[in-house]
A protein has these predicted regions:
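Conserved PLP-enzyme active-site core in the AAT-like
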Residues: 2-297, 301-328, 336-361
């Protein structure tokens, strides 16, 4: 019997559920470039409502959502402040600089992804022709699976606005942040979502990660900003025709898969707990659905290869990253833990040619 694969590389690997596929097949369609695909319009209205914004724009990818947002906020030659390990700066191909002529100013982040308020204030350039004009602060929530504290988001966004900066949120996994915040506060996840997004002028939300849709992201913000982003999307090749097929999956996910993200968080904690105490491992458990593991003595590649042989997939660069999602269950997590334990119990854990993938995705 073939063992079921436990794919913990990313929450992007999920497949559409049968109900989601049915919603896609039944979706009314039009031509979204002409603006008359009813399912795309319904999705845009729904995510704008959930985030408390005037409008939203459906995009193929989160990278494009972030880039269109930056290009809508900034003029050519402007600068945006961003964490040195933030996705928009490190993992999106340098698009802001290459395609938007926007200069990033990367700033040091602590172990929780926070940029100190002092560093933020000092990085804002004076109004002088020698400097790029600092016009935007970009934050990310969640960051490496960690939820940004509301107190920090409030202080950072207030500081930015006091200096005339707009504030953008890379909210690829903001639904995870909202669900975790709701669990801590005993409140509704969608109410927490609006609390988070209310602090930002714009927010990108990914549908193809924990929510489980096959494709898509949305940029949400003021109507005038979304109109600028629409022009940028066209220029970047993001206009799609009968994209209601994809929007239907995202709309289904918004209506059915938000609350269930809590199950992914429970599985991540189950994984972290199971890996605790293994000699040679240092577990950095997160608030939500991502667990990082540092592997001692340079054995990360060998561990990755061992896991692949046992039908467990992960990614790694410095240590390994495991991401839980709707296609993983408790049995799969327990198998992953047992596989890691077998590796460290074995003497055959030497060098390996397994490729370490750079992530995060």
């Amino acid at each position: 019997m073939t063992m079921k694969k436990v794919d913990l590389r990313s929450d992007t690997v999920t497949l559409p559920t049968p109900a989601m596929r049915e919603a896609m097949l039944k979706a009314p369609l039009g031509d979204d470039v002409f603006g008359d695909d009813p399912t795309v319009l319904a999705l845009q209205d729904r995510i704008a409502e959930l985030t408390g914004k005037e409008a939203a724009l459906f995009m193929p990818t989160g990278t494009q959502s972030n880039l269109c947002g930056l290009m809508a906020h900034c003029q050519r030659g402007d600068e945006y402040l961003v964490g040195q390990h933030a996705h928009t700066y490190r993992y999106e191909g340098g698009g802001a600089a290459v395609l938007g002529s926007i200069q990033p100013q990367p700033l040091t982040q602590d172990a929780h992804g926070l940029i100190s308020l002092t560093d933020l204030a000092l990085a804002i350039k004076p109004d002088d022709a020698h400097f790029a004009r600092t016009s935007l602060l970009a934050l990310e929530n969640t960051w490496n699976g960690k939820r940004m504290p509301m107190s920090y988001l409030q202080q950072a966004s207030q500081l930015a606005r006091e200096h005339g900066l707009a504030v953008h949120l890379d909210g690829a996994r903001v639904m995870n942040a909202a669900v975790d915040q709701a669990a801590n506060n005993g409140t509704d996840p969608l109410a927490e979502l609006r609390q988070i997004t209310s602090l930002f002028d714009s927010v990108s939300v990914c549908f193809s990660k924990g929510l489980g849709a096959p494709v898509g992201s949305a940029l949400c913000g003021p109507r005038a900003l979304i109109q600028k982003a629409h022009r940028a999307r066209k220029m970047l090749g993001g206009g799609m025709r009968q994209s209601g097929l994809l929007a239907a999956a995202a709309l289904y996910a918004l209506n059915h898969h938000v609350a269930r993200l809590a199950q992914d968080h429970v599985l991540a904690q189950r994984l972290a707990t199971g890996l605790q105490g293994i000699p040679g491992l240092s577990v950095r458990s997160a608030d939500t659905n991502i667990v990082f593991v540092d592997v001692a003595h340079g054995k990360g590649a060998a561990l990755l290869a061992h896991l692949q042989q046992e039908h467990v997939l992960a990614t790694g660069m410095i240590g390994l990253r495991f991401v839980t999602h709707l296609d993983v269950d408790a049995a799969g997590i327990d198998h992953a833990v047992a596989s890691v334990r077998r590796f460290f119990q074995s003497d055959a854990n030497g060098a390996s040619t397994a490729q370490l993938h750079g992530g995060p995705y």
